[in-house]
């Protein structure tokens, strides 16, 4: 069932891409006559110690995913990053699983970033300002995951002019509004999408209906010349129904997030940021059956709630020394499964008990810069309470780099991370449901990693980045009986993990040609119950390439050919 749905959606979304782009895969954009572009910036910006940012301005040259500028799909093309199984919208980094990557959307944790069963993500290309993946050194300001940090931020609205855009496709509709609240003082941004392939799905004999919709909003206002307040919201929902002779099955999931941020500049040497947030994920499954006087209706929900806060200070103590310090707090509630049913008029209500996880952390990072040298030395101290036990973790982190100039550099880093959350997958009526639970038996997951890499400018327009890493993990839970696990009756064992690999990325940029190619070799193993075996998502060799070329370039018009190979 799941495979049929995935194949059908894939064909539909490919059709959407063909409908929304010209037949020759050429994209068009207007250029101002008086502007001369000497060279494009690369699509991927490789920073030190495994941190890579996507150049949002250059994303317009990239091929569309199902007619969408999906930033998350490009993150999956980075060296050392995998989407997992076909169609997944996860980020599996350096031998880790999807739950080991912390995904922040304007500093709000996201538990399910998928639209259309993983073919697209919740991050609209019309609203994203920046996107970055940290695989090596991760600032002590962030924790609670073993493998990586992904930060995606939405842009502000235009503070000068009101703007509108509308995109109408064969299967989708999208619109964006932004502009000033008060000129030069504040702005608003509203963007919405609606995907409706029902007309095409109706061709199939099994009467499947599917769609998703989402809306993103952001308000920003300068309450003082040194203090800026912003409010961000997101809400999205996927829904599918399958009708048969006497039965109707429905599935769906949705995210809701909200954040309030205050950014302050106290003086030339001290800045602060305070964020309060709420995030909510719901998975649901609904069935209804009627035949010969018998009726059965049931609805099962799986929910995750989290609210929290983060306070960060950046302080410059001298020309060579600066500090980043602060605190975080979060309260998470997990409702693994709750079922309501009505069988011939009889009401039933059952489910697993809710679980709580309360956590807090203090962090400090020292940053030293002199000449071409840069060093970061920091520590994160965290506490996790699951209502039965409290566990503590101390996570030292450090990196050292040297910049030779002209885009040549080397770096070395070492990190220790801990994790108190467990994610596993279970199928209900052939549909996958992700469960999140806190740690069990007083054991946190732990990992340490060392990375060594460098970047060299081989030619005026050619840059090569290479990085190797080695990682160890322990207390990794392997769940073999989900019912016993959710009931607190065992159903799992602990294991260890090991991963090492080499990542390389080659970038070539000229005025008309942009080429980015990446290769990853990785070996990831797990060991549990005395048996060592390859990690489920281990891909020893992975190659991706993206190229775009301005086929025709003349004043007032430009034709760009783009191609992606994986």
Model regions and ranges:
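Gram-negative outer-membrane beta-barrel transporters
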Residues: 470-472, 492-566
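Outer membrane beta-barrel strand-and-loop segments of large Gram-negative receptors
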Residues: 306-312, 351-363, 439, 443, ...
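Short strand-turn segments of transmembrane beta-barrel domains in outer membranes
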Residues: 118-121, 129-140, 148-179, 187-210, ...
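Surface-exposed extracellular loop regions of Gram-negative outer-membrane beta-barrel proteins
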Residues: 185-192, 196, 239, 272-296, 338-342, 354-388, ...
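Periplasmic N-terminal accessory/gating domains of Gram-negative outer-membrane beta-barrel systems
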Residues: 48-96, 107-138, 155
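Short, acidic, small-residue-rich periplasmic hinge/interaction motif at the N-terminus
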Residues: 20-61, 98, 265
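Transmembrane beta-barrel wall of Gram-negative outer-membrane proteins
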Residues: 171-196, 205-239, 250-278, 317-323, ...
């Amino acid at each position: 069932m799941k495979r049929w749905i995935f194949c059908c959606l894939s064909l539909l979304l490919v059709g959407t891409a063909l409908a929304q782009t010209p037949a020759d895969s050429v994209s068009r954009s207007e250029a101002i006559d008086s502007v001369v572009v000497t060279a494009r910036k690369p699509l991927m910006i490789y920073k030190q110690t495994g941190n890579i940012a996507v150049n949002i301005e250059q994303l317009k040259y990239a091929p569309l995913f199902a007619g969408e500028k999906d930033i998350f799909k490009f993150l999956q093309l980075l060296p050392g990053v995998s989407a997992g199984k076909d169609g997944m919208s996860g980020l599996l980094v350096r031998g880790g699983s999807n739950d080991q990557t912390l995904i922040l959307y304007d500093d709000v944790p996201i538990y399910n970033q998928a639209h259309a069963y993983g073919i697209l993500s919740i991050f609209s290309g019309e609203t994203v300002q920046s996107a970055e993946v940290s695989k090596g050194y991760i600032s002590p300001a962030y924790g609670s995951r073993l493998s990586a940090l992904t930060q995606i931020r939405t842009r502000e609205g235009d503070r000068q002019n009101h703007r509108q855009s509308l995109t109408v496709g064969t299967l989708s509709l999208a619109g964006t509004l932004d502009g000033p609240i008060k000129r030069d003082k504040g702005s608003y941004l509203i963007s919405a999408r609606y995907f409706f392939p029902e007309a095409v799905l109706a061709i199939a004999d099994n009467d499947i209906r599917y769609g998703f919709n989402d809306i993103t909003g952001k308000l920003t206002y300068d309450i003082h010349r040194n203090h800026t307040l912003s409010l961000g919201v997101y809400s999205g929902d996927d829904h599918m129904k399958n009708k048969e002779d006497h039965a109707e099955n429905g599935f769906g999931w949705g995210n809701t997030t909200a954040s309030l941020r205050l950014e302050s500049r106290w003086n030339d040497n001290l800045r602060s940021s305070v964020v309060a947030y709420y995030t909510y994920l719901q998975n649901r499954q609904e069935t209804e059956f009627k035949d010969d006087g018998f009726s059965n209706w049931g609805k099962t929900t799986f929910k995750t709630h989290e609210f929290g806060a983060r306070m960060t200070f950046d302080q410059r103590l001298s020309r060579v020394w600066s500090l980043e310090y602060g605190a975080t707090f979060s309260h998470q509630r997990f409702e693994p499964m709750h079922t309501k049913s009505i069988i011939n008029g009889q009401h039933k209500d059952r489910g697993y008990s809710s679980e709580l996880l309360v956590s807090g952390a203090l962090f400090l990072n020292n940053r030293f810069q002199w000449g071409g040298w840069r060093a970061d030395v920091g520590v994160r101290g965290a506490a996790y309470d699951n209502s039965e036990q409290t566990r503590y973790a101390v996570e030292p982190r450090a990196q050292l780099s040297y910049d030779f100039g002209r885009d040549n550099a080397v770096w070395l880093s070492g990190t220790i991370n801990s994790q108190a959350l467990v994610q596993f997958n279970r199928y209900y009526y052939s549909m996958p449901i992700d469960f999140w639970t806190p740690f069990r038996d007083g054991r946190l997951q732990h990992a340490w990693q060392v990375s060594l890499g460098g970047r060299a400018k081989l030619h005026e327009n050619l840059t090569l980045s290479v990085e190797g890493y080695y990682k160890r993990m322990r207390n990794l839970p392997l769940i073999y009986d989900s019912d016993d696990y959710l009931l607190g009756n065992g159903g799992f064992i602990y294991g260890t993990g090991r991963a090492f690999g080499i990542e390389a990325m080659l970038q070539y940029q000229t005025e008309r040609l942009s080429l980015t190619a990446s290769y990853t070799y990785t070996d990831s193993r797990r060991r549990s119950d005395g048996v060592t075996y390859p990690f489920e998502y281990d891909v020893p060799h992975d190659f991706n390439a993206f190229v775009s070329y301005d086929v025709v370039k003349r004043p007032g018009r430009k034709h760009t050919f783009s191609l992606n190979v994986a």
